[in-house]
Amino acid sequence: MTTTGTTAFNMEFTELAEEAWERAGREMRTGYDLRTARRSLNLMTIEWANRGINMWTIETGTITLTQGLATYALPTDTIDLLDHVIRTQANNAATQADLSITRISVSTYATIPNKMVQGRPIQVWIQRLSGETNPTTAVLDGAITATATTITLSSVVGLAGSGFIRLGTEDIYYGYISGSVLGGVFRGQNNTTAAAQTDGTAVFVPQLPAVTVWPTPDGSQQYQFVYYRMRRIQDAGAGIQTADMNFRFLPCVVAGLAYYIAMKVPELQGRLDMLKKVYDEQYALAAQEDREKATLRLVPRIAFIGGGS
């Protein structure tokens, strides 16, 4: 007998929900059963992000740095950066170089005496914000062109001393506030396009994940910030869509969803202990396999008192 010759098995969300409900102890009967399963799946994938690194969510990205601009937005679904370098002479096979850039804390960045000094960046502070957008009471006090480098607002109450604002579809970075004027402005950030804005345009504050490099890039050469990021797992969608995860996690997602569902249904809570045990076991199996398998070599650093290091 022959085998199928295929390795494409996956499960649509409706199938995941049906299997989870059956494991929890009863059939999925109503539209609400499907809706509550979708909500539980979204919460569970957030739990997975809190547990650690999910290899299938690692993506690479590149930001071309601008002279005089220290802070750059990351994609809004970024959870954290795993590694990063500064690239010089990009795309030149003979001279391209990826150079180390050290991650620092907010307290370390805060104690840098001159944050405006320019040079090749050697340190980076990562701001792990939510990606949500908040409204403000401020509006534009006067129209601006697409090239304006200062922006006057009706009020700056609630704005950070520096950061991002959103006008229409354009994200704008400002470096400082003087009175009601935003200065040190860089237009068209976060892959948006600089555009003219009319008087009275509402001001929003996007909580963009971002990196701040130091020294601030100079103009001696072109720098790129190359990073590997961990992104959020995509939302559970409609019934015909598959889950955003590696196939190795399908047994885990079904077991976990069954446990989450049973927590919400009183007549199923007698199965909670068993479902939790199965969920933990399946997660451990999947997480153990979903990892890098590379050689690790540790070398002791030997130093002598009075002899330097």
Question: Could you tell me what each predicted segment is?
Answer:
Residues M1-P135, R166, F204-S309:
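Glycine-enriched, solvent-exposed interface loops adjoining structured elements
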Residues M55-Q67, L99-T102, L129-F204:
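Autoprocessing Asn-cyclization modules and mimics
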